[in-house]
Every structure is written in C-alpha cells, then in structure tokens.
Amino acid sequence: MKKALVIKFFMGNYLISDIETKDKITAQVKGKLKNYDTHKKELFIIKVGDIVIYENYLDRYLISEVLERHNELNRPNIANFNQVILVFSLYKPRFQFRLLDKFLLILNKYKLKIILIFTKIDLITKKKFLIIQKKISYYENFYRIYYVNSKNKNSTHHLMDIFSNKITVLAGQTGVGKSTFLNSLKPSLQLKTQEISKKLGLGKHTTKNAQLYEFNGGYIADTPGFSKLDLTIFDYEELKFFYPDFLLYSDKCYFKKDCSHIKEINCGVKKALKLSLIPDWRYDNYLKFIEKIQEQKKLNYNKK
C-alpha cells in the first residue's frame, strides 16, 4: 500500500503522483472506495489534491482509499490546498466589487488564505486604473494584492515566491486571464487561452477540469471558472461573521454578536460606515447578499 497525490482526472482514470518517488501513475478506483467520511450520504467523489492509498494489482494501479481532507471546495472539486489566489480582470470581463465580495465571503467561510491578483491593467487608461486601484486598496487591510500587466511577461516574476512549496488554487471568473497568468509563470505549460465573448462580455471556458501543475516546489491548481457562487450555503444571520472589516467594529455594537448591522441602534459597523471607515459599496453588497439569501430560502421553502 502506497500514498499518492491526485493530480488530474480524465475519462474515468486518475493521474496520481507517488508521495515518496514522485512517479506519475495512471490509476483507477478499486471497487467500493473507502473514505474518511463514512456517514456522508451523497456519493463520495475523489478530488484533485486528495491523498490516496493505492496498490498494484495484476499490472493495474488501483485506488482503494481516500485519506482525510484538510479542506475542500466543491466548485471546483479540489482538496488539501494551502491558499487561494483570486484573479480578476480590470478590463474584460468587467470587474465588479460585488463579485469580489461574493468570492471573499464564500472563501472566508472556509477559513482559507486568500491572495488577490488583478490582471489586464495595461488595457485600461492610467486615470481609470488609479481610480479603481484607490478603491481596491481598501482590501489591502486584509489581503495581499498584486497587479499584473497582461502584455509584460516579466510582470509576474516577482510573484514566484508566493507559490513556493504550496498547493495553490487559482480561481476567478472565467475569462479573466488565469491560464495566461499561469503561462507567464511557466511557459512550458502552454495552457489554452480564449477570446472574450463580445456579445455577452463574459469569458468562454478554457479550463474544463481542475488539474495540478508542478511549480516552484509545490503545485498550482488551474480550475474551471466558478460558474455559480451559491450564497445559500449561508444563513443570513451568519453572514456578518465572514466580513473581517465588520468584525473590527462589531464589538462596539450595543447588541454585540446579535447585531445584524442593519436596523439596530448603536451599531458599531454603521457608525464606521458613517465615518467612511467602511466603504458604501462594501456595506451595500452586504445588504444585497442578505436580501438574495432570504429570497432564495423563501423560494426553496415554497417549492416544498
């Protein structure tokens, strides 16, 4: 019995890398798969990043067990990573603070380390860049932020160290330049890139399945764009706990942890909002997310 890291899934097979030898092996699942979560009701699926037990049987390599995961995501299907790099374009597809906040909200729920990278800064005017950079700088209080010139391949070299000896998930809206960014880091990958749909202003999928690529002593996971960010994983009452900026002021709320930061009196978060310590758009997005969750929950209830 040996341990391996799942690198890729393709046509019912898994490309795995032996933990000790680093040999790449094509393996299949051996009958009923053993996994750490025996109480899980839904079908258990092997994910890229899983550590598995495999064996050699009649000249075939078979995966017999999946070891316990440290963390995982469902969109994309990936596990056991160290950090998430969110990639956003400042050109096309159009950058939206609401989408950024939505990503951050969901990833914060899973207590993941997040780094922000903004691409295509060379495709907008300097004036427009400075305006949007000023707003984005608010997030520097909580996350590391980098800007990338899509035409200058040397603009990514200073980012090499953040990948060192880590499994990094590269995520973001489709069409923002994730594959281009990866190619600039490691040209030998030669990942496919795509044109943006002129009609919709949205990206066309290039990456179809999550896959790990060896890089700088670790791995980079190029993932399919998040086609759907589902806020129904939240109860609207818990949303406030995943805003690190809200938490800075919530201890000053009269109702403490019970304050929703909406209609309550003596709310520390709303006071910070009035003092411009929290941006208007950030708070407005919070209200929109709560409204969306309540609407969806009500819709789901009526379907029963």
Curated annotation (Swiss-Prot):
Stated family: Belongs to the TRAFAC class YlqF/YawG GTPase family. RsgA subfamily.
Gene3D superfamilies: P-loop containing nucleotide triphosphate hydrolases, Probable gtpase engc, domain 3
Cofactor(s) required, per the database record: Zn(2+)
Organism: Phytoplasma mali (strain AT)
Domain of life: Bacteria
Top-level class of the enzyme under EC nomenclature: hydrolase
Protein name (Swiss-Prot/TrEMBL): Small ribosomal subunit biogenesis GTPase RsgA
Cofactor mode of binding and number, as noted: Binds 1 zinc ion per subunit.
Protein's GO biological process: ribosomal small subunit biogenesis
Keyword Calcium: no
Residue stretches making up the CP-type G domain: 70-229
